[in-house]
């Protein structure tokens, strides 16, 4: 989860987030190298006579600065397309959970079970227990089995929302009248926090998301107790 004055991304807890962090580092290195080269050339132009005012045509130079950026863009695009494909691909999910955005709370329905549905509201600051996080704790957590592919179906009852859990690499728009889907897979147990990431009204900041990833046996016991 996030912590004060954090500069980097949250620790990856899913295969998708691991790939996103690797892609971020890959792209950042390319940007750093290009920026360093440009600054070096600018410094040479300012401190030396690295100019040719009489040059009217430089076919070789124009070819280089056309082909080289194209190659760089391809090096950035290929891993990006790979991750997009991974995020859209859902193979044999063991569980499907439908989540609906409301002003200003989330509702969840486990479609593989009968009558397993609930609303999830933020816990007010005055009702927090020791150890619970302000503006992030909810009264009903979404309990899911870890290390298994889970399909999330996401929509909205009223306005645009966005269901996001950064440490799992998840951010999917909740659009009225449209059903979007995302894959949830966690490498480890724990609590994973997120929030609505689309400005949806005056209480937009009070729509937290809490996923509790547990071993399959614990999930089966929890689901049996909820039905």
Curated annotation (Swiss-Prot):
Mg(2+) binds at residue 198. Its cofactor is Cu cation. Its EC number is 7.1.1.9. Residues 1-14, 88-227 are mitochondrial intermembrane. Pfam families: COX2 (PF00116), COX2_TM (PF02790). Cu cation A1 binds at residues 161, 196, 200, 207. One of its GO terms (cellular component) is respiratory chain complex IV. GO terms for biological process: ATP synthesis coupled electron transport. It is a multi-pass membrane protein. Its main location: mitochondrion. It catalyses: 4 Fe(II)-[cytochrome c] + O2 + 8 H(+)(in) = 4 Fe(III)-[cytochrome c] + 2 H2O + 4 H(+)(out). InterPro entries: CcO_II (IPR045187), CcO_II-like_C (IPR002429), CcO_II_C (IPR034210), Copper_CuA (IPR001505), Cupredoxin (IPR008972), Cyt_c_oxidase_su2 (IPR014222), Cyt_c_oxidase_su2_TM_dom (IPR011759), Cyt_c_oxidase_su2_TM_sf (IPR036257). The chain crosses the membrane at residues 15-45, 60-87. It is found in: Mitochondrion inner membrane. Binds a dinuclear copper A center per subunit. Belongs to the cytochrome c oxidase subunit 2 family. Component of the cytochrome c oxidase (complex IV, CIV), a multisubunit enzyme composed of 14 subunits. The complex is composed of a catalytic core of 3 subunits MT-CO1, MT-CO2 and MT-CO3, encoded in the mitochondrial DNA, and 11 supernumerary subunits COX4I, COX5A, COX5B, COX6A, COX6B, COX6C, COX7A, COX7B, COX7C, COX8 and NDUFA4, which are encoded in the nuclear genome. Component of the cytochrome c oxidase, the last enzyme in the mitochondrial electron transport chain which drives oxidative phosphorylation. The respiratory chain contains 3 multisubunit complexes succinate dehydrogenase (complex II, CII), ubiquinol-cytochrome c oxidoreductase (cytochrome b-c1 complex, complex III, CIII) and cytochrome c oxidase (complex IV, CIV), that cooperate to transfer electrons derived from NADH and succinate to molecular oxygen, creating an electrochemical gradient over the inner membrane that drives transmembrane transport and the ATP synthase. PANTHER family: CYTOCHROME C OXIDASE SUBUNIT 2, CYTOCHROME C OXIDASE, SUBUNIT II. This is Cytochrome c oxidase subunit 2. It comes from Hylomyscus parvus (Little wood mouse).
